[in-house]
């Protein structure tokens, strides 16, 4: 029965598929918003003609891409599909809660879209800072709807996190220790812990903002003894772990893809990889004020947050060099997934280097709120998180669907996307170094050249998205079934065939330990 299977599902594979489809669809919406942004900035002068609507688009682009594309696809899609298969569990620990986690997202998305449809929309940026987000600068229901949208997305993620933590700790075979689980399972576990600890703080902050707006409290209003800086601390205590939540599952995916296509039976430095992810997760919670170097922190506070932020480069470097060591001496297969993974390693590293530049509080005074910051986080998100999602998608597509993608189309898709994103975001470093500020719909003529190049790049990326849609259609239309899978003995998820049966591991799993 269609309704029973897809609306009331308690099956991790079906829910994972729902997450992947929802994330792909939201990704199209987010891409459309980004194209509007780049169309506006493609030449000097106004296109949309209104700065408020421009900022509404920027805000919606961020929320859609983060909460409705990257997180649902990585954690909800790949996490649901692969974690139970990789640890030999029959399903998730709480299958019905799993379904609720997914079905909280469409209403959340609806509220976000509704916020742009009423009044003037929420043109606050994704940070939703008061007083701009207060009830004077943003009168009307827009920001309130955005806050409710975030509440639903947050509850969804918290429930999902509880589910993953319970599943991974509790549903392994008795003989399997945590240090025998694959790196993707580790990455999801650490991500879930980060979600569980950071989201309640965001909920507190936006709830206080809600009461400031509607119930006359003054948490963030100096007139009543409040402080807008308190909101920034609460938001970024969530916001910084959040960016690691977005990339950690990607680290797990890349570890699997690189190992598989290097012909290795295990990644280089397994324990180091685990240690590095745990370190990144911990450090992610104690660096939040590096987003606030311009608000007037004490010099000793700035010194601490500068050095603490730089420390994160060490475990990140451990991971990058371990991936390179995994490649070393391998029988490398230049599959599309491997290309995405290699692109990830290179471009994520570039994004990390600009992050090190920004971690210097003195330099950040100049670079804060310029396009240098935009370039930095789009390198680690648009070429880190997205490349990881694409690597995982083309690698596990035969597992999810039972069909194979066309190799040539997949490689062409990678090439066009690679050119597009680099052409879009590399020039933004130059704009930032020249002082072009973020979140403005127009700019002085001096910035025209690189903005035009950047906007052209975004249209190349759009072409890549269209090719991807065609590539997926082509795979389902041609129905090339999977012949055989290499290395299934060290890649447990492939053990049951492509696609696996509806129920896997119905009897308890046993592991022989040597």
Swiss-Prot record:
Mitochondrial matrix side: 1-14, 81-93, 167-185, 256-271, 325-337, 394-408, 474-514
Positions contributing to Na(+) binding: 40, 45, 441
Residues reported in the UniProt entry to bind O2: 244
1'-histidyl-3'-tyrosine (His-Tyr) cross-link, chain position(s): 240-244
GO biological process: cerebellum development; oxidative phosphorylation; response to copper ion; response to electrical stimulus; response to hypoxia; response to oxidative stress
Membrane topology reported for the UniProt record: Multi-pass membrane protein
Function: Component of the cytochrome c oxidase, the last enzyme in the mitochondrial electron transport chain which drives oxidative phosphorylation. The respiratory chain contains 3 multisubunit complexes succinate dehydrogenase (complex II, CII), ubiquinol-cytochrome c oxidoreductase (cytochrome b-c1 complex, complex III, CIII) and cytochrome c oxidase (complex IV, CIV), that cooperate to transfer electrons derived from NADH and succinate to molecular oxygen, creating an electrochemical gradient over the inner membrane that drives transmembrane transport and the ATP synthase.
Protein name listed in UniProt: Cytochrome c oxidase subunit 1
Species for this entry: Mus musculus
Organism taxonomic ancestry: Eukaryota, Metazoa, Chordata, Craniata, Vertebrata
Gene: Mtco1
């Amino acid at each position: 029965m269609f309704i029973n299977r897809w609306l009331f599902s308690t099956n991790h594979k079906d829910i994972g598929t729902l997450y992947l489809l929802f994330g792909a669809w939201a990704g199209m919406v987010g891409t459309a918003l980004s194209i509007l942004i780049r169309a506006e900035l493609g030449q000097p002068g106004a296109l949309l003609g209104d700065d408020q609507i421009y900022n509404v688009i920027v805000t919606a682009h961020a929320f859609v891409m983060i909460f409705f594309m990257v997180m649902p696809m990585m954690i909800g899609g790949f996490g649901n599909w692969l974690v139970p298969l990789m640890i030999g569990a029959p399903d998730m620990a709480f299958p019905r809660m799993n379904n609720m986690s997914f079905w909280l997202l469409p209403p959340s998305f609806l509220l976000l879209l509704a916020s742009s449809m009423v009044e003037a929309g929420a043109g606050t940026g994704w940070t939703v800072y008061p007083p701009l987000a207060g009830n004077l600068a943003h009168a009307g229901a827009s920001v309130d709807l955005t806050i409710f949208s975030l509440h639903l997305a947050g509850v969804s993620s918290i429930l999902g996190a509880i589910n993953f933590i319970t599943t991974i700790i509790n549903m392994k075979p008795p003989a399997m220790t945590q240090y025998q689980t694959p790196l993707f399972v580790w990455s999801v576990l650490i991500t879930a812990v980060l979600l569980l600890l950071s989201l309640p703080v965001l909920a507190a902050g936006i709830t206080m903002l809600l009461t400031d707006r509607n119930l006359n409290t003054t948490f963030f209003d100096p007139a009543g003894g409040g402080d807008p800086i308190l909101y920034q601390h609460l938001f970024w205590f969530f916001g910084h772990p959040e960016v690691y939540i977005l990339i950690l599952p990607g680290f797990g995916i890349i570890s699997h893809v690189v190992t598989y296509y290097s012909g290795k039976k295990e990644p280089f430095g397994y324990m180091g990889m685990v240690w590095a992810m745990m370190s990144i997760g911990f450090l992610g919670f104690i660096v939040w004020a590096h987003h606030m170097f311009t608000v007037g922190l004490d010099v000793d506070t700035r010194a601490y947050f500068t050095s603490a932020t730089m420390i994160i480069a060490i475990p990140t470097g451990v991971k990058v060099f371990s991936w390179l060591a995994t490649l070393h001496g391998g029988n490398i297969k230049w599959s599309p997934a491997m290309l995405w993974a290699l692109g990830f390693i290179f471009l994520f590293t570039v994004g990390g280097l600009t992050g090190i530049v920004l971690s210097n509080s003195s330099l950040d005074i100049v670079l804060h709120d310029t396009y240098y910051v935009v370039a930095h986080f789009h390198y680690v998100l648009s070429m880190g998180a997205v490349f990881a999602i694409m690597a995982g998608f083309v690698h596990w597509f035969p597992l999810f669907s039972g069909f194979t993608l066309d190799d040539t189309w997949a490689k062409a898709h990678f090439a066009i996307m690679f050119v597009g994103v680099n052409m879009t975001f590399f020039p933004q470093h130059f704009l930032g170094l020249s002082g072009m500020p973020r979140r403005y719909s127009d700019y002085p003529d001096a910035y025209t050249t690189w903005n035009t190049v950047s906007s052209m790049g975004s249209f190349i990326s759009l072409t890549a998205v269209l090719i991807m849609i065609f590539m997926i259609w082509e795979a389902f239309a041609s129905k090339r079934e999977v012949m055989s899978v290499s290395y299934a003995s060290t890649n447990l998820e492939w053990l049951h065939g492509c696609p696996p049966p509806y129920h896997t591991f119905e009897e308890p799993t046993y592991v022989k330990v040597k």
